[in-house]
Amino acid sequence: PAMARGMIKPLVSFYIGGMGTYYHAMFCRYGWEANANEVRDLYNAGKRKEAAAAVADDLIDAIAICGPADHCRAKLQEWRAAGVGTALMNLPTGAPFEMAAQLLRTMAP
């Protein structure tokens, strides 16, 4: 999970620090105010790598499913049972088509 979290943290830091105030305010409302403020401040200071590294693991775990396939399938099933109807799946930029196809096959219900 740590490697997978590391892959999504830059995107989350962009949402918090680089997309206006909406997502920053949302994370503040959801209980991550201190972390959102730290990430936003680092991001806006041009410290993008530091901002990404500062995104809390528990924040990532609350909004994303990261880790080995068995763990991801189990978490996705938990989310479905909780009422989540649509999940977005992200791959690293430039990932080959076959990687995307394999992800979809692996995560299919």
Each predicted region: which residue ranges?
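Active-site-adjacent structural elements that line small-molecule/cofactor binding pockets in enzymes
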Residues: P1-P109
